[in-house]
Amino acid sequence: MNTIQTYTDDAVRLLQSLIRIPSVSRDEGRAADLLEQVIRDYGLSPRRICHNILVDERSDDDSRPVMLLNAHIDTVKPVSSWTRDPFTPTLADDRLYGLGSNDCGGGLVSLLQVYRYFKTHECPYQLVYLASAEEEVSGANGFSLALPQLPKIDVAIVGEPTGMQPAIAEKGLMVLDVTAHGQSGHAARQEGVNAIYEALDDLNWLRRYRFERVSPLLGPTLMNVTVIHAGTQHNVVPDRCEMTVDVRTNELYTNDEVLAFIQSQLHSEVKARSTRLQPSRIDPAHPLVRRCVELGMTPFGSPTLSDQALMPFPSMKLGPGQSSRSHSADEYILVSEIAHAIEVYIRMFEKS
């Protein structure tokens, strides 16, 4: 049996075991226990950081650049339209069904096998493996908690499902709480100041404004009003109109820059829940990106968020599976996609 097949078989067995254990964000403990034990059984030395698992076996006198291999343990909650048990791994021909199989169990187990492979084969990088928690909710006990425990990282691969095409840029995210203020009064007497009417100009601006800097990889920065709450009953003029705005920033802006601009344009009060989920980009001339192109891959920009947003070092997403299957009913990954991923990673790192 060839090496790729052996590692693929191990990856699929591990993924099946992980699917059997519910690991919704903030409840990954049992899945992390299993993964930690399997890593020990492989003869490696994992370190637990809450529900994150770090494998860092570098030598202090090694001068090679350090590459982080990262993917997440946690899943979203299963949607109601599943026609299978989401926690029963099912193989049907080439498809492995189960919650988290595609997002991003395939990347999680594939990158671990690649780490194992390079324990006994030459690699131009020193590899560090991190299975992170709470990625789906950008939680405080996920990648952010593990980040200070990492060594100095030169570049990272994030194993999100990209069809094994390199996502070299990723949009950032801000969620804004926007509040228009008025003054309550009796609706029958035209008293007060209607906060809904006060919000109309701001709503119109949010709908129509187009940011000038358009990324060739990620397109424009986008704003969408997704939630509105106002009023308590029909005969009371509302004194507050509260809106939620979803902002997806391209890599030509920082979140802080966009927030300050929006605040300067709106009459309403604008507060960001967080600005830490920044857009990211790796230089297309980076050796790792060039190696991807040599192997026939096509770099692209990704609109979806990952732990890449929290990485203060060059990174790109590259993993088995398809983003379109993520968070969907009857989620699956192809066993052949896992095998292909392991083979491609090894080819990339052997000659980067």
Task: Describe every region a protein language model picked out.
Residues 64-128:
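Active-site metal-coordination/substrate-binding segment of hydrolases
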